[in-house]
Amino acid sequence: MADFLGMMKQAAQLQSKMKEMQEQLDQVEVEGSAGGSMVTVRMTAKMELKAVSIDPSLMKPEEREVLEDLLVAAQNDARRKAEEAMQERMKALTGGLSIPGLGLG
């Protein structure tokens, strides 16, 4: 019974730490870029897009397809970095344990 109570206490502590970490993820920002930084995208580790910066030379009708491709690439780069930041914090929180459903594997 004591083991069960200990596990419940640990679960409650983990839940509290996870809530705190989720709040911290709102503050963590990453930047993705493409085309030699001609397009940059900034987002939080929770995948909320914060800003997009586009080099003025891409703002021409004939550059439309290039710009579209670079926007997608920069967003994907930022998303990958955000996922990595979130996983690093989750691993620190869980002590490297593999917990199903957390996407740490």
Swiss-Prot record:
It comes from the Bacteria. It is found in: Cytoplasm, Nucleoid. NCBIfam families: DNA_YbaB_EbfC (TIGR00103). HAMAP family: DNA_YbaB_EbfC. Belongs to the YbaB/EbfC family. Homodimer. This is Nucleoid-associated protein OCAR_7544/OCA5_c05960. It comes from Afipia carboxidovorans (strain ATCC 49405 / DSM 1227 / KCTC 32145 / OM5).
